């Protein structure tokens, strides 16, 4: 049944399949990466998304009020985004989640780290919708704690660099569009983990801001 379902999805839908990367062959440690450039291509085929992304060029930074981060100086003064040319701005989000009962005996044994991305070009009211959030990486949280983020994020960062330097050809628009990550979003523990800090609230400096 699973094979037939997968075959049907591949045939009738534009499925971007995950790619398995090996972290430690001896220990059988792996992670899954969903190719971001292919995902971007599929998402940009949606006419509604196209319309909102194209409109963003005219509206970014045009408000005299702070309605989103696009109205702030950090975005307006960014040389990559501040021009008239259309740029794709992405938000990355990192978080851990339990796939077992968090109060049961299997707590933390099967915790998974997910890395997601969202179009920052679309209106802020739409960014928190589940349909606007796309998965990029899945890895066991214990493997990341042992081996670090560098190996797990390597394929994602390599293709993001390609997006920034070479761009992505969008057939429906008939041109190459460049883009990059504007910011990385996470809760306090997730941000400390990505930044290489201790994930604890017990110390005298409980967050990365206290260190400074």
Model-inferred region functions:
Residues 5, 21-26, 99, 212:
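General alpha-helical segment detector with a strong preference for membrane-spanning helices
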Residues 71-212:
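Domain-level cores of phosphate- or acyl-group-handling catalytic modules
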Residues 1, 14, 45-46, 123, ...:
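Alpha-helix capping and helix-coil boundary motifs
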Residues 1-18, 22:
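Long, charge-dense tracts
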Residues 25-108:
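Structured nucleic-acid-interacting core domains from mobile-element enzymes and related host factors
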Residues 17, 21-23, 34, 135-136:
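Generic detection of short hydrophobic beta-strand segments and adjacent strand-loop junctions
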